[in-house]
Amino acid sequence: MADTITPSELHTLLAAGNVTLLDVRRCADRAAAPQGIPGATWKDPELVESWGDELPREKPVVIYCVRGGSVSSSVQSALRGKNLDVTFVEGGLAAWDASK
């Protein structure tokens, strides 16, 4: 899988049901704006080493943060280090919201 995915591509994956979607926004960002992408499971990006091994390997993993920047990139790197197929949403939650 590529490094990033567009909101449009994510819509397609979600419709097919063939993706594990994770909200990796920092705690403070999530508390300030709790509404995320429907179907996503929140995981604390600061604790990626503790939950990364629990992710299913049979489906690709898509992650998102607020803007698709450093948080997504660092979580992606950590999960790829665990041999997971991981992409993140270009522009993060902001781009997803703008695409609706």
Task: Map each language-model feature to its residues.
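Rhodanese-like catalytic fold shared by cysteine-dependent sulfurtransferases
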Residues: 1-19, 24-62, 67-100
